[in-house]
Every structure is written in structure tokens, then in C-alpha cells.
Amino acid sequence: MTRMIDDVFKRKTIIPKRLSDFGFQKSAAGYIYKTEFLDGAFLAVITIQNNKIDGHVIDLTTGDEYFQINVPAMQGSFVNSVRTAYQKILNEIAEKCCQAALFASP
């Protein structure tokens, strides 16, 4: 199973100097970006350490990670709306903070 974040950032190179302008905060371990979405129901947490990007979606009602976004078998209008909103966040980060890595291996 491929995670959505891995698909979005495949063959992309992160440009560190663009991260702060986008809203990432520098931390001891790297960079972190947090943003609420879907009217504050969810929190996207994106981290970058050693040029590797990782992300999680937290359901703010329960405080639990909303893992359903990465399970293709999970379908329905609600989970699809969460996926779409999260993908929009990831796509914006990729567009504004990365460049294409033309010769990267898959």
C-alpha cells in the first residue's frame, strides 16, 4: 500500500529555503507544518527530517490519527472528502516547496 504523501512527493526534491515562507517551523529535528482543515475537524501534520517528508492527519474530535486516508478499501463520501482536502494541502506544499527531480529513481 502506497501512502498518499509518498505518491505526491515521488520524484520531488524539497527546497529548504522555501519551507519557512510556506509556513513550516524549524525544529531541532527538521521542519514541521500544521494546519487545520475541513472546518477545523482535522489537523494535517507534515514533518521533514533529513529531506524525507512524512505526514499524518489527526481527527480533532477524537485526537486519533485518521489512518483511513491511506486505506484504498475505505470508501464513502466522508473519507473521500478528507482525502481530497488533505491531497490539496500536500499538492500545495509540493508546488511551492519542491522542484521536480528529473532523474530520481522510483
Q: What kind of feature is each model-predicted range?
A:
Residues T2-R3, H56-P106:
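Intrinsically disordered, low-complexity regulatory regions enriched in serine/threonine/proline
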Residues M1-T2, D7-F9:
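A short, structure-level motif marking secondary-structure boundaries and short turns
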Residues V8, K12-K52, L60-T61:
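Ser/Thr-rich, low-complexity intrinsically disordered terminal regions
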